[in-house]
From Swiss-Prot:
CDD domains: Trans_IPPS_HH. It catalyses: all-trans-lycopene = gamma-carotene; gamma-carotene = all-trans-beta-carotene; 2 (2E,6E,10E)-geranylgeranyl diphosphate = 15-cis-phytoene + 2 diphosphate. The keyword Membrane applies. It is found in: Membrane. Residues 249-587 are annotated as: Phytoene synthase. Its main location: membrane. Pathway: Carotenoid biosynthesis; beta-carotene biosynthesis; Carotenoid biosynthesis; phytoene biosynthesis; all-trans-phytoene from geranylgeranyl diphosphate: step 1/1. Bifunctional enzyme that catalyzes the reactions from geranylgeranyl diphosphate to phytoene (phytoene synthase) and lycopene to beta-carotene via the intermediate gamma-carotene (lycopene cyclase). This is Bifunctional lycopene cyclase/phytoene synthase. It is a multi-pass membrane protein. Its EC number is 5.5.1.19, 2.5.1.32. The chain crosses the membrane at residues 8-28, 35-55, 77-97, 120-140, 150-170, 172-192, 220-240. One of its GO terms (biological process) is carotenoid biosynthetic process.
Amino acid sequence: MGYDYALVHVKYTIPLAALLTVFSYPVFTRLDVVRTLFIVTIAFVATIPWDSYLIRTNVWTYPPDAVLGPTLYDIPAEELFFFIIQTYITAQLYIILNKPVLHAQYLNSPATLPQWIKSGKLVGQLALSGSVLLGTWLIAKKGEGTYLGLILVWACTFALFTWTITAHFLLALPLACTALPILLPTVYLWIVDEMALGRGTWAIESGTKLELQLFGSLEIEEATFFLVTNMLIVFGIAAFDKAVAVCDAFPEKFDKPADALAMSLLRARVFPSSKYDMQRILGIRQAAARLAKKSRSFHLASSVFPGRLRIDLTLLYSYCRLADDLVDDAATPEEAAVWISKLDRHLSLLYKDPDATSTPLASKYAAENFPPSALSALDMLPTSLLPREPLAELLKGFEMDLSFSNSAFPIADPEDLELYAARVASTVGQACLELVFCHCQHGLPDYMKAYLRNTARQMGLALQFVNISRDIAVDAKIGRVYLPTTWLKEEGLTPEDVLKSPNSEGVGKVRRRILAKALDHYGEARDSMKWIPSEARGPMIVAVESYMEIGRVLMRNGGSAAADGSGRATVPKSRRIWVAWSTLMAA
């Protein structure tokens, strides 16, 4: 009886697992629990027969004074725990690194699959098949290559299966989502294993190994083992996540979302890719790209929303951003007015009838009147879950922007500022909440939903005031001043002065007044967010806090923005992540 192997866990594996658990805890969902249990169970069950064979045939040994004693099929308890802890560590890292990624956008049908992915899948199949054959030959040959052969035959057979059913999805994902969860735990375990082998905690029997070391005492067989097992873990979770992505991307095919853990998830796993609605996938892809490019704060917050709600919120953001860009990027005020009119007409067609008969009319109108790059955002707006009023009011906010083109400054007083912010931001806040009500299980009575709608609109005011305070210099470059003229007058300024010198001391004082109003609205609405349905509460608070942090940075700077070169105040990415993590811990 000894404690050497147990101490390896105490010193190296358990602390790392605990650290990853603390980091992932705020974003760890019920679906993540199932992911982890799924892959840990498979890894544990699949490894026991193989490892037991190694020990019984004396390929792999443990000195009696290095282990505690209890065994299962001759496998020491510490080794059994290693199966679990290694899988858990790799799974946690995979989950953390994949949170920012909207997996649905990486689905492909055979018709849309890039050639390099097709080739990559084939290369992987050939490499894994070759590894199985090499392993078979080494086992048959017996002698020094036996242990490596047993590793290759066992691991690469499973890997070949999961690669075959998941490679198209795996290869489409960013490398950070797949390569890092394999490589980082592998290198860490190489270091741990090298120290353990050097101390004799466990040993590979002479005559069954190649006597080659990757570095130090680390045998090439052990290095291969950790690499291929971490590949198996990532391949297995990716196979699970592909089913989740399919289930969430196509609500018309699967009545229950993936996080409901219903039969829909199993059906999604075998749903043929040839039946994917690729117009929808391409639309989701474009919407996700627009969100990532245009709003770092909301993109970060979107990472922690549940699947279908995340998709619909992304589509809503894409529509609102597209509409804003069409108006802002118009060459003339007349062109901008035309875009607003077309957007209003498109909304009228979308909401013309309670059934779907108007959708083809809206799609046809969009195809005839909007650029091709706009069509997916227009067609995929989730109107079946949204009332028309907030979207129509948003267009009225764009109409206020047109007043600037007539050499007029429409924000004459604080009431105009509130009206403008209500139209362009409170509306979006309410629309987001409507999607939450549709996607999340709740028993909220109508009066409470009305109360939360008012709260969302008030929080929208706070966020828009922060936005205005941040972008004074940016807006001045295009001839716009959203600061109330009456407040400017109190500082001896006019809107024209802001255009000439947007970073003056007087402008800074007005900025601070707007930020103070933003914090007032935030303070009045923040506590009410505790009544938002639990699935969306934390993510919604993250969205708010990530944006309000910009306001706090501006306040700490005395009202003058630290700019990123475009005139916009910035919050470092590390700070945004900390705000999101700490917010979720407290939510």
